Swiss-Prot record:
Keywords: Cytoplasm, Hydrolase, Metal-binding, Nucleotide-binding. GO terms for molecular function: 3'-nucleotidase activity; 5'-nucleotidase activity; exopolyphosphatase activity; metal ion binding; nucleotide binding. Its cofactor is a divalent metal cation. It comes from Clostridium beijerinckii (strain ATCC 51743 / NCIMB 8052). It is an enzyme of class 3 (hydrolase). A divalent metal cation binds at residues 8-9, 39, 95. This is 5'-nucleotidase SurE. Binds 1 divalent metal cation per subunit.
Length: 253
């Protein structure tokens, strides 16, 4: 397959390099990724400023690679619309940290994959829960699961309007219990605002968020922290079809 690989952690992030090394053994890979760290960019795109696209050399990789000064969604657009590589699949990741629950709405990783489906290209988002503060993460288990899901999906289930959102738990590989296909949960946080500086220009704060207790069983949040790999099909259409007819009756009287 002709695969576009992107992320939101930046073109030199170890997760994207580990993924590209393995995927490129069996597929034609093009990397288009942000020049810098762009986590939590959500689905933003660059419309008020120009973007810089630069071909890059990444040691150990024998595939085309480009850095983009914009957002993860910009990167997907560049890969699909500007480079014209006839992409058949978009893979976004491997993200350092999980993208589960309603956190997916903030995620540049997931949004880069969703951008692919908006343009009719099947997409997979891959993220791995990590021990924060640790810089030498081993992404090999996440790579194995990504390839396993890719191999199954390309034979059984790759749909042009669906993102497969894959998350790997922070468990030793031998202790992972298997894979659960499940719904997203609801992520809420207790946010603390910490004053850093105060002057005539205003008050400068940093934030610290602590996740509230997970209440929804059978969700991606629940299963991930029980030691399961989670897989959730996502769609860019936010329409609530369950109540669409009821709302129509009320407002189209």
């Amino acid at each position: 397959m002709n695969i576009l690989i992107t992320n939101d952690d930046g073109i030199n992030a170890p997760g994207i390099i580990a993924l590209a090394k393995e995927i490129s053994k069996e597929h034609k890979v093009t990397i288009v990724a942000p020049k810098d760290q762009k986590s939590a960019s959500s689905h933003s795109i660059s419309i008020h400023s120009p973007i810089k696209i630069k071909e890059e050399f990444i040691e150990g990789l024998d595939c085309k690679a480009y850095s983009v000064s914009g957002t993860p969604a910009d990167c997907t657009q560049v890969g699909l619309s500007f480079l014209k590589e006839n992409i058949e699949l978009v893979i976004s990741g491997i993200n350092k940290g999980p993208n589960v629950g309603t956190d997916i709405l903030y995620s540049g990783t997931v949004s880069a994959a969703i951008e692919g489906t908006i343009y009719g290209i099947p997409s997979i988002a891959v993220s791995m829960d990590v021990e924060y503060g640790k810089d030498d993460e081993d992404y090999s288990k996440a790579v194995k699961w990504a390839i396993k899901v890719l191999d199954i999906a390309k034979e059984e289930y790759l749909k042009s309007d669906v993102v497969l959102n894959l998350n790997i738990p922070n468990f030793n590989e031998r202790d992972i219990k298997g894979i659960k296909v499940c719904k997203i949960g609801r992520s809420t946080y207790k946010t603390e605002y910490i004053l850093l500086e105060s002057n005539e220009e205003g008050d400068l704060y940093t934030t610290k968020g602590t996740r509230n207790a997970i209440k929804e069983e059978e969700s991606d949040l629940y299963y991930l922290y029980q030691g399961y790999v989670t897989l959730t099909p996502l769609h860019f259409d936010f329409t609530d079809f369950a109540i669409l007819s009821d709302v129509t009756k009320i407002f189209e009287k």
